[in-house]
């Protein structure tokens, strides 16, 4: 069974107004800045903080000071991963509460605000080169790492799951509001994110050597700062023996996040088996995949998606069910088929995070017609749901971190 782990980006917010707060540095006080893009000399300001892991840490800096990233260790099953997601959220929220703030699993901010880029040389260069794209990039995604035995297997997996990733965007959609505006999208984060030069679906590579040639040519173009800006929907991790899938919004419910990860792991295993059986990847044009991603971002589960077999419109529920059917043999072997169906039906019945945000807005406006009050209520609802059933991290528990992800 392959191990898997996740990274969640969370919004730091004022618990009353809902406004994003530039407090990431404060939340990381006493912890190493362990993100890939952290400065070369991480600060340790309070070595006696009982929530600090003496190795890496479960909280890391991101592009914006209004967000914080949590990371899990590699896990073997849904229950273990769900627990670590909850612990990571609790760790971040506990740190935020020390500064009269909270964290919320929101993929974009419903409240308009001025954002602040995390101060380090790399981000400063990105700000200078990419301008408004960086300024407006307060987006929170959900990244799933799944073990692969080799880069060759990883590229084969990427080639064979690329046509199915838009379904995960629809399932995880959690960003209908953007800076005080109802966007009309279910995952507006996807729209904001896809302004980067390399973001979105990638071509079929065929071999690891071709993958490396493409990456090298992108770097040689001079447009990108470094390999960290290879933002494909699915890519080989630079730091772990994993495929990293990057298409999902951060999910309101921790249970939904763990479900997305389970589906990703099953997709990776299914793709690997196809590769080993000599099944070629579906030759879907990249431009068609971009359209499928756009449709998923726009409609979520409320309308039609592009079926990943025919790429013709089909009811979202049918496309989601087809995805579960596709990975059902792997899920059954891993004793996760029933929980996957339960999780998918829960989202279909209850609605995505975007639908829940809109409902919170409507319920508030029924008693208070001011839009600002409604958006603040959306954030307050998100804080409550994000932390629901989340277990506090005690001094005896290590902060969750993404270590080497392996197969057992």
UniProtKB/Swiss-Prot annotation:
Domain of life: Bacteria
Gene3D superfamilies named in the record: 3.30.590.20
Pfam families in the record: GCS2
Enzyme Commission designation: 6.3.2.2
EC top class, as a word: ligase
Compositionally biased intervals (Basic and acidic residues): 37-55
Catalytic activity: L-cysteine + L-glutamate + ATP = gamma-L-glutamyl-L-cysteine + ADP + phosphate + H(+)
Statement: the UniProt record of this protein carries the keyword Protease: no
Keywords annotated in UniProt: ATP-binding, Ligase, Nucleotide-binding
GO MF annotations, alphabetized: ATP binding; glutamate-cysteine ligase activity
A Gene Ontology biological process term: modified amino acid biosynthetic process
Region of interest: Disordered: 37-57
InterPro entries for the chain: GCL_type2/YbdK_subfam (IPR050141), GCS2 (IPR006336), Gln_synth/guanido_kin_cat_dom (IPR014746), YbdK (IPR011793)
Family to which the UniProt record says this protein belongs: Belongs to the glutamate--cysteine ligase type 2 family. YbdK subfamily.
HAMAP family linked: Glu_cys_ligase_2
Function: ATP-dependent carboxylate-amine ligase which exhibits weak glutamate--cysteine ligase activity.
Name of this protein: Putative glutamate--cysteine ligase 2-2
Organism of origin: Arthrobacter sp. (strain FB24)
């Amino acid at each position: 069974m392959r191990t898997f782990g996740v990274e969640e980006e969370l919004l730091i917010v004022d618990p009353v107004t809902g406004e994003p707060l530039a407090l990431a540095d404060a939340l990381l006080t006493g912890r190493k800045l362990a993100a890939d893009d952290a400065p070369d000399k991480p600060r340790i300001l309070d070595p006696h903080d009982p929530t600090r892991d003496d190795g890496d840490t479960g909280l890391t800096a991101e592009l914006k000071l209004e967000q914080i990233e949590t990371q899990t260790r590699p896990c073997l099953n849904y229950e273990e991963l769900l627990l670590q997601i909850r612990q990571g959220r609790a760790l971040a929220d506990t740190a935020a509460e020390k500064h009269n703030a909270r964290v919320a699993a929101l993929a974009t901010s419903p409240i308009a605000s001025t954002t602040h880029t995390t101060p380090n040389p790399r981000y400063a260069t990105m700000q200078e080169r990419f301008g408004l794209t960086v300024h407006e990039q307060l987006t929170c995604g959900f990244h799933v790492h799944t073990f692969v035995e080799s880069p060759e297997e990883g590229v084969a997996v990427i080639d064979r799951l690329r046509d199915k990733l838009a379904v995960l965007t629809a399932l995880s959609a959690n960003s209908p509001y953007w800076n005080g505006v109802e966007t009309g999208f279910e995952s507006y984060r996807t729209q904001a994110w896809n302004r980067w030069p390399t973001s979105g679906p990638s071509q079929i590579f065929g071999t690891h050597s071709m993958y490396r040639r493409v990456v090298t040519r992108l770097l040689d173009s001079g447009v990108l700062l470094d390999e960290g800006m290879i933002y494909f929907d699915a890519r080989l991790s630079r730091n772990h023996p994993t495929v990293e899938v990057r298409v999902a919004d951060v999910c309101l419910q921790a249970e939904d996040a763990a479900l997305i990860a389970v589906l990703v792991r099953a997709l990776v295993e299914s793709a690997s088996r196809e590769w080993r059986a000599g099944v070629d990847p579906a030759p879907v044009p990249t431009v068609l995949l971009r359209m499928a991603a756009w449709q998923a971002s726009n409609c979520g589960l409320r309308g039609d998606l592009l079926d990943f077999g025919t790429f013709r419109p089909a009811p979202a529920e049918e496309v989601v069910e087809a995805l579960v059917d596709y990975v059902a043999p792997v899920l059954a072997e891993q004793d996760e088929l029933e929980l996957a169906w339960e999780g998918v039906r829960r989202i279909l019945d209850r609605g995505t995070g975007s639908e829940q945000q809109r409902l919170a807005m409507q319920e508030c406006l029924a008693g208070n017609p001011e839009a600002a009050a409604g958006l603040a209520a959306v954030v307050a609802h998100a804080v409550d749901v994000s932390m629901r059933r989340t277990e506090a991290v005690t001094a005896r528990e290590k902060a969750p971190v993404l270590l080497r992800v392996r197969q057992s």
